[in-house]
Each structure stands twice: as C-alpha cells, then as structure tokens.
Amino acid sequence: MPNQRIRIRLKAFDHKLIDQSTAEIVETAKRTGAQVSGPIPLPTRKERYTILTSPHVNKDARDQYEIRTHKRLVDIIEPTDKTVDALMRLDLAAGVDVQISLG
C-alpha cells in the first residue's frame, strides 16, 4: 500500500480502557513493520448536567453529574498488508468506539 495512511480515532468514557486499546493498536502496527505516529491525546469533552433533587420546592437542592469523553488519535504511516490484516483481527474492549479512515 504505497503512500497510504490509516487514521484511527478512539473514543471512550474510561481513560484506562482507551489507553489500553491504543497500546494494543500501536504494538500490533509496530510488530507488523509499519510506522506509527501517536497516540495523540485529543481534548477531553466534559458534559455537565444539573438536576433538581426536590420534586416540588427547594430549588437550592440540586445534583450535578459529569460525563467525560476521552479521545485518542493514532496514525499508521505506510501500512503493509500484514498490518491491515492484524488490525482487522484485533479484538478491542467493548467500551471503546473506533473510527478508521484511509487517506
């Protein structure tokens, strides 16, 4: 695959899980002879929600919740056919969203 690049974006709520998945991807790509750029940490998205705990009055009684979405970016430069096959067979954790683009 001359002049190819595989860009892998990972999203997860658990930072330990996403770091483990990126380590597996990088190790697999390096083992098959491809150049790897990354993992590059992208900005973490924080979504905050405020909910009233009282059903009627007492507006001061509130709970606050936060969801953090962690993101990582891995570029595989000049992948071989063995690299693509190994990445297709790779089994990642269930809590990690993976987006792959060729370019």
Curated annotation (Swiss-Prot):
GO MF term (any one): structural constituent of ribosome
Domain of life: Bacteria
GO terms under biological process: translation
Keywords: Ribonucleoprotein, Ribosomal protein
UniProt GO cellular component terms: ribonucleoprotein complex; ribosome
Pfam families registered for this protein in UniProt: Ribosomal_S10
Endpoints of the signal sequence: none
InterPro entries with a match to the protein in the record: Ribosomal_uS10, Ribosomal_uS10_CS, Ribosomal_uS10_dom, Ribosomal_uS10_dom_sf
Keyword match Cell inner membrane: no
NCBIfam families reported in the protein's UniProt record: PRK00596.1 (NF001861), rpsJ_bact (TIGR01049)
PANTHER family in the record: 30S RIBOSOMAL PROTEIN S10 FAMILY MEMBER
Subunit structure: Part of the 30S ribosomal subunit.
Membership in a protein family: Belongs to the universal ribosomal protein uS10 family.
Role played: Involved in the binding of tRNA to the ribosomes.
Protein known as: Small ribosomal subunit protein uS10
